[in-house]
Amino acid sequence: MEKTYNPQDIEQPLYEHWEKQGYFKPNGDESKESFCIMIPPPNVTGSLHMGHAFQQTIMDTMIRYQRMQGKNTLWQVGTDHAGIATQMVVERKIAAEEGKTRHDYGRDAFIDKIWQWKAESGGTITRQMRRLGNSVDWERERFTMDEGLSNAVKEVFVRLYKEDLIYRGKRLVNWDPKLRTAISDLEVENRESKGSMWHIRYPLADGAKTADGKDYLVVATTRPETVLGDTGVAVNPEDPRYKDLIGKFVILPLVNRRIPIVGDEHADMEKGTGCVKITPAHDFNDYEVGKRHALPMINILTFDGDIRESAEVFDTKGEESNVYSSEIPAEFQKLERFAARKAIVAAVDALGLLEEIKPHDLTVPYGDRGGVVIEPMLTDQWYVRADVLAKPAVEAVENGDIQFVPKQYENMYFSWMRDIQDWCISRQLWWGHRIPAWYDNDGNVYVGRTEDEVRQENNLGADVQLRQDEDVLDTWFSSALWTFSTLGWPENTDALRQFHPTSVMVSGFDIIFFWIARMIMMTMHFIKDENGKPQVPFHTVYMTGLIRDDEGQKMSKSKGNVIDPLDMVDGISLPELLEKRTGNMMQPQMAEKIRKRTEKQFPNGIEPHGTDALRFTLAALASTGRDINWDMKRLEGYRNFCNKLWNASRFVLMNTEEQDCGFNGGEMTLSLADRWILAEFNQTVKAYREALDNFRFDIAAGILYEFTWNQFCDWYLELTKPVMTGGSESELRGTRHTLVTVLEGLLRLAHPIIPFITETIWQRVKVICGITADTIMLQPFPEYNAAQVDEAALADTEWLKQAIVAVRNIRAEMNIAPGKPLELLLRGCSEEAVRRVNDNRSFLLNLARLESITVLPADDKGPVSMTKIIDGAELLIPMAGLINKEDELARLAKEVAKIEGEIARIEGKLSNEGFVARAPEAVIAKEREKLDGYAEAKAKLIEQQAVISAL
């Protein structure tokens, strides 16, 4: 094996070999239990980020673990067409490169442009997924707009429509005036903002007066531009100030519309003036009030968010109405909505109807992609009746057919599902699944899989002109069918029979409503088992937290703190990293701040660490459901782990290759260390399997690290040296056999988390073991063998380790060179301790670097010594001739003085009010941590001074 571990040399060729050999495919053995994971499809034109790397590491670990247990495994891969996101990217691209809009192209040519863009950049993310070592079946790769999935989408739409679970209606939606499309509640980002509350007088009609004799009501609003669309004023029916006015009218300022005063509990007596203007076409709460009181709906805005030239007036059913005039005052027509706000406030003020303006803290809805203020807008949209679909989906989680890990996410799921609103599924975009609905010239709607089917089913001749609905479906509509459409539905395929329901879904909690809930609803409605019982899409939902930067900040391009997982695998120079973080920024003014932070954090760029180190780090940080702060030091630590495993394997191979390791017979004697490591290994297997079975990848990674680094490398390899240098033939055979057996088992154990290094080493080790199989990934996963857990060997070895560590600690405390042989005295020994010393004298002499071991009588004071107490014995190391008392005390005094200087410096900092007020919380915490560390170090040095003074 190469002297040093270079992941760059082994990872890509190895992955290509795996893929070429077809190792990632299901084994096709239907007698075996199947295990299937559906990858959450990333955006087809996107690139891999840390969230992907994190979730995919977890999924690949599970898939490799189950594959090694002989299960028929499928990790289904695919990408998402990502409607709004992809359309925006291509629109920006043609604007920047050609100065054109999508309208210059026209629908068909623009869609062709997107397909072209997908062909050019769609492979980036799948190439990156290969670099992570993902063992997905690439031959089954799907795309949410491939022919099969498009057919599944049409099938679902048509069936739901025929079951009256999809309908078209004029309702209020979140409208993004920049993207000119409806967006879902989940795509709205509510931001806190400082605004104003305008108090406007609405004159009472017909000579009516308030209880205190006023001839007007004062209405408070944060959106005065919507006054033009008011169709009522609500007061609380219990409000003594206004209840006698219910049923009377006010005259709406500026448009002189006569609108009713209604009694509704939506009006809060304690809030504002107690009078609320009702604009059903431009506010979600007002829409509900309007429905309750049959108030007409007046739309005053265009799809761009400008004031219309004439309003649209509808009744509560959404049908056109002439109950009110559609006239809008000429001075407000065509004004942009926020310009209209100023103009309307000025006009109201000029009429003497502006009572006051108060500062007001408010929550403003923004579109998370378009980045502009969202308008509630009355539009024709397609909806899914969600309550019908939600009922069985709630029951599936209640009765345990689907389990959330961690369990607390069930509450989040229930709270949303039990109060579910109808789902608006239409989007005013061009890229996506076009809605399979057609209209004739009379406005009749026909739904079918194709236009031909529509004509046939409805007996429409060629003379009837039909035009297809212009809208496309919400991206999440096709994603909701992901678990079954990818397996060939609506056909009853073998894949669907073998792999559905799938086993585990790995997802971030941020898309629990967008995706998880909708998959459960859609799957249970369309997929039934042979008894007609609805099938769940998956049995377990494993929720992950978000990956944040080292300060706990969300990673984002605008903060310049994004870390590309492949930069940690391959490394990146500082200039390249700076260009990546500051090039093409939406907010170029942030570039300098980002540059400074990056230079401080990565002065030499990022070193290459290899895929396995990245995967190990991600697994180790995967504590269920909690957000994760990324830690470069952990990554370095796991790269060191890979180096340690490599070097340990080289040691094993150097001592076993072309040697008699007992695989072809011959007597074998196992040393205490051999019996101990076999026991340790089996206990590790048991705990590790339990952790993986319970989705505790962090615990599994910790168990693997502890056994490999501490037990196998640091202890066992050292404990083999006495046998290797002076053992009999049968002892040598036993130790070599154990070395190879444990290493081979360890490689299989570690393979799901760190596949590349384990496969590479295993290819050498398998030869010694006489294994002829081609790849580690199809080898059986290690199983716990209770017969190999030798309790006596465990107890004896732990005692020897205690003794060796005690001697090493005395060396360190007394500053004695590691290679200097020492005399060891033992006093007050139990019979067990004496037996252990006598049975394992050569181990102790070798590993503790001792020249002699003497057991003293219990009452023997012995010479002046440093002592340590261990189980059943007191250890003494005589100090005569080992240290110069005066020199050692002088050295310790110097150390104490140095530490006291550091303590004074930090205490000074922390007592400086200016520093404490300005410094971030994390910096202060770090300084306090340092202070505690120095205080502890000082206490230890003072303890040592006391011991040496007493010598």
UniProtKB/Swiss-Prot annotation:
It is an enzyme of class 6 (ligase). It comes from the Bacteria. GO terms for biological process: valyl-tRNA aminoacylation. GO terms for cellular component: cytosol. A motif ('KMSKS' region) lies at residues 554-558. Belongs to the class-I aminoacyl-tRNA synthetase family. ValS type 1 subfamily. This is Valine--tRNA ligase. It comes from Salmonella typhi.
